[in-house]
């Protein structure tokens, strides 16, 4: 049975995609729960139109993410941390601290879940963070950890 998904469904497909599933799965679970529609001609046309609009929105979001990446890559972000002897930080720099520094110094609001590090940051100096701005746009941001006075 062919159905049109109303939202992304892990292991099955993406929103507005036409997929084939077993009739019982469609009738007893996907359609009653509101996850899918029967793929008749009318619904197929609506899904195609929605897919075109969604593709246009995604292209715009990608373009916006690229412009943000260009702007952020040119900035020098500084993060203050409490330091012990030998220049070692108490604890480690976290994605939340990076997100807060970005918001404070640039005005860009980043989700902490989109920020990652290659390895834990426990020393002073220049380091890199990987920020996922979009599915296809990933920024490697250089930042400096300085001692808090």
Curated annotation (Swiss-Prot):
Gene3D superfamilies associated with the record: Ribosomal protein L9, C-terminal domain, Ribosomal protein L9, N-terminal domain
Alphabetical list of InterPro entries matching this protein: Ribosomal_bL9 (IPR000244), Ribosomal_bL9/RNase_H1_N (IPR009027), Ribosomal_bL9_bac/chp (IPR020594), Ribosomal_bL9_C (IPR020069), Ribosomal_bL9_C_sf (IPR036791), Ribosomal_bL9_N (IPR020070), Ribosomal_bL9_N_sf (IPR036935)
GO molecular-function term, one example from the UniProt record: rRNA binding
Keyword terms, alphabetized: Ribonucleoprotein, Ribosomal protein, RNA-binding, rRNA-binding
PROSITE patterns: RIBOSOMAL_L9
GO cellular component, one term: ribonucleoprotein complex
Family annotation (Pfam families): Ribosomal_L9_C, Ribosomal_L9_N
Keyword Cell membrane carried by entry: no
GO biological process: translation
Family indicated by similarity: Belongs to the bacterial ribosomal protein bL9 family.
PANTHER family for the chain: 50S RIBOSOMAL PROTEIN L9
Name by which UniProt lists this protein: Large ribosomal subunit protein bL9
Organism: Amoebophilus asiaticus (strain 5a2)
């Amino acid at each position: 049975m062919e159905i049109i998904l109303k939202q992304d469904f892990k292991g099955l497909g993406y929103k507005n995609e036409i997929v084939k599933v077993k009739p019982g799965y469609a009738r007893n679970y996907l359609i009653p729960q509101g996850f899918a529609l029967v793929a008749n001609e009318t619904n197929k046309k609506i899904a195609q139109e929605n897919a075109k609009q969604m593709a246009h929105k995604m292209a715009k979001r990608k373009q916006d993410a690229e412009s943000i990446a260009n702007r952020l890559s040119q900035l020098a972000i500084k993060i203050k941390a409490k330091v012990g002897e030998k220049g070692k930080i108490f604890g480690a720099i976290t994605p939340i601290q990076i997100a807060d520094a970005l918001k404070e110094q640039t005005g860009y609001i980043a989700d902490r879940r989109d920020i990652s590090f290659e390895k834990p940051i426990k020393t002073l100096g220049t380091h890199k963070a990987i920020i996922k701005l979009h599915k296809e746009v990933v920024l490697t941001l250089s930042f400096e950890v300085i001692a808090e006075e």
